[in-house]
From Swiss-Prot:
Its main location: cytoplasm. It is found in: Cytoplasm, Cytoskeleton, Cilium axoneme. Coiled coil: none annotated. GO terms for cellular component: cell projection; cytoplasm; microtubule cytoskeleton. InterPro entries: CMI2A-C-like_dom. It comes from the Eukaryota. This is CIMIP2 protein CG18335. Belongs to the CIMIP2 family.
Length: 323
């Protein structure tokens, strides 16, 4: 019977952790071999067990605290809460303030993040209630006697709402200033294409995979400088087109803008051929051979002018390749 039961302590077969000097011993089963190694005083062991005991105390980073649970229960009673305790691991949605909770289990980190968010929102709501209560007291519309703590609130000498007073009523002469164009109030959701040229945020961030107007012909610059100049050229060209279309409503406060040079947007140049890695279409390039790619694509648009009256397929036509 003693040989049927492995004595304690021993490691269960299938344990994938480290056991000192186990790989140097042979001839016994895993359980008996680890039993000999664990009780051998000549073998250096760790001062404490790696695996925590079953009856170990619950750590602060393993489970949410009582204060956090109280905040979550109060929140569920006030609003239709999406985040209900416990927030199970595997939830792929957004959890507020979860990123700042480091070294905790998912349930503890998510509960702490939501509790912190609810505490901050409660401070905002308390401040909002204080401001509304103070405005009600200052306006004189309250039908109740002010308490001691209400008397300590900061007050002004004026009753709200205030009455607008012009400069003439004060005896001050109005200054005649030329009309100014109001600057558009841009928000953080405004596209950088329509920001002012002087705006520091008028550029495209790295990783943007959409079309950036007038950026094809620019190179050798950083992404911020390149996209800023491209967007400035685009907005200038857009205002130029608007002025040409609506001459009566042109904005005279902006300097005159000229159309960008057409040479920047020419694909087939008359004095040079295409680069060998160009993967686009070149007119007549399929029916030419015996020359380099640059010589073949030299002045490519001339092929269309020479064969503009072509009525049959180029394969069966008597084409002129001598140009």
């Amino acid at each position: 019977m003693d040989h049927a039961i492995t004595p304690e302590p021993h490691l269960v077969p299938g344990y994938t952790g480290h056991c000192a000097q186990n790989r140097d011993r042979v001839g016994r089963t895993y359980g008996r071999q680890t039993h000999k190694l664990l009780i051998d005083p000549c073998i250096y062991h760790a001062p404490e067990l790696i695996v925590a005991p079953i009856h170990a105390k619950r750590g602060l980073k393993d489970y949410p605290t009582e204060q956090e649970l109280k905040i979550l229960r109060t929140r569920e009673g006030l609003v239709d809460s999406v985040y209900r305790h416990p927030i199970l691991p595997g939830y792929a949605g957004f959890v507020p303030n979860k990123v700042s909770q480091i070294g905790k289990r998912y349930v503890a980190a998510a509960s702490a993040g939501v509790a912190r968010h609810e505490t901050l929102m409660e401070l905002y709501r308390c401040e909002n209630r204080t401001l509304r209560h103070r405005d009600l007291l200052e306006s004189g519309n309250g039908l109740f006697d002010r308490k001691i703590n209400e008397r300590l609130l900061p007050q002004t000498y004026y009753r709200s709402p205030l009455i607008l007073v012009t400069g003439v009523s004060k005896g001050i002469k109005d200054e005649t200033c030329p009309p100014k164009t109001e600057k558009l109030c841009y928000s953080k959701f405004t596209s950088p294409h329509f920001l002012e040229d002087e705006d520091a945020d008028k550029f495209i961030i790295n990783g943007y995979s959409g079309h950036i107007p007038m950026s094809v012909t620019r190179f050798g610059e950083s992404n911020k400088v390149l996209t800023n100049r491209a967007l400035c050229s685009f907005s200038d060209y857009m205002y130029k087109r608007k002025r040409d279309t609506w001459c009566c409503g042109q904005d005279l406060s902006r300097p005159s803008i000229t159309c960008p040079p057409v040479g920047h947007f020419v694909v087939y140049h008359e004095d040079s051929g295409m680069v060998p890695n160009y993967a686009g279409h070149v007119p007549g390039e399929t029916y030419k051979f015996g020359r380099t790619y640059a010589k073949t694509t030299y002045d490519a648009k001339r092929w269309l002018e020479v064969h503009k009256n072509l009525t049959v397929l180029p394969e069966v036509a008597n084409l002129d390749y001598a140009y």
